[in-house]
């Protein structure tokens, strides 16, 4: 769903509790080179200027200043678009981080709060709505393939060369993967399998080659 808000709001504000959320704001005039600061990222944010990836922000980064992550902005002479895609990676259910709202709180150009955001909520629970007729190329990217299964035995999909994302088998989200490990393969329950099967992968950061291997053996790292 799309929304228009004056300042960034959390996923929960829009009634979303998992998945991803995208914030976009437009700069309509000349902006000199300066630092851009993003406030309170929960959990991973991918920052784009006019569609080009410029920074990745992790909530675990230790070089924050009063909750802000900072990166260099080269400025613009005829306006530009700033986009921030935030990936919610789970919930902290104890201690000081119990109040764990997902998204960002603000984007600042120097000390100026940027105003006016188009927000798209992406719960990632409806892969059947993905339009694969659109031309891809840049990450994040949905990829689709098909495979045959001779039986409904449990198996594992190995994602060597992929970096970070999630996998759907016949429309069912079987889980997330991340190259930092330790897990190197995702479990596919046999009951999900048919004679002809569809696999969809959402890769957020890029992969060496768009190939996976499905075997009967796990890889626990």
Where are these regions (language model features)?
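Carbohydrate-binding surfaces of carbohydrate-active enzymes
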Residues: 1-101, 107-109, 114-115, 127-132, ...
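Aromatic-lined ligand-binding clefts that engage carbohydrates, nucleic acids, or primary amines
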Residues: 33-48, 82, 147-169, 177-178, ...
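Short clusters of small/polar residues that mark proteolytic maturation junctions
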Residues: 58, 178-179
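Terminal leader/tail segments of proteins
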Residues: 156, 186-221
